[in-house]
């Protein structure tokens, strides 16, 4: 018997609890929830949320961050849809509903490859240019992905978490024992530690994800988001990622940084240092009164 696939509509309704925190016009309901799709590639069953807009001149690939998933961002995607834009939001494994086949290793390179493949697939459908929009660490994923795809015509990021900068690694970790000693151990003993799984709450300052304690608690307890246990291989490869194209040499497309003003997890100065090095057309907008998620 064929295995039935999980669904946010029928089997995993936790996301419905988030809706009360959003303005009524972008809340998800029976007639406004994203279309759910599945795609099997690279040893991954990839879950994708789609908010269609047939007349949209572009497609927006919305990339979640650590401790998130595509459905968590869907009210923001709904806002974009209401303005005429089609949005595609994949769940990057092991977050959300996506899952890997036996023997598939979950690491940062896999995430980038999946995103590039989604871009190629979407472009082949109708030739519409792609804009990548990344939230939290998804901002840097948007940058890495755009550096590999000629179809990306714009990058929008809420932060640039460049983990090649040791000060950035110290900033996002709960303490320097994790950011320095922990990283050193993962680098020395990948064969022993790569398959160990921990919650992102244990290796980051996830308690700073929003400026609303109730919403933060909801995200922290979400079994498809911050409560998901990730393999240390994903963390190790994320922390060791160097930009394949340095920002001074990046020529792919314009960049828009929309940075939360009240973001204690990744203060603006860290994103600004990367943003200032970009040689392309760029703009920075500060989201007044906002934290990293809301």
PLM feature segments, named:
Residues 290-294:
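Catalytic histidine-centered segment of alpha/beta-hydrolase-like enzymes
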Residues 70, 77-100:
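Conserved alpha/beta-hydrolase
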Residues 137-230:
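Alpha/beta-hydrolase-fold enzymes
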Residues 251, 257-259, 263:
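Short beta-strand/loop motif that positions the catalytic acidic residue
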Residues 1-40, 44-51:
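An N-terminal hydrophobic leader/cap segment in hydrolases
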Residues 253, 267-276:
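Short alpha-helix in the alpha/beta-hydrolase fold that links the catalytic acid
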Residues 65-68, 136, 261:
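Active-site glycine-rich loops that stabilize anionic/oxyanionic intermediates
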Residues 67-69, 96-127:
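Catalytic nucleophile-loop/oxyanion-hole region of alpha/beta-hydrolase
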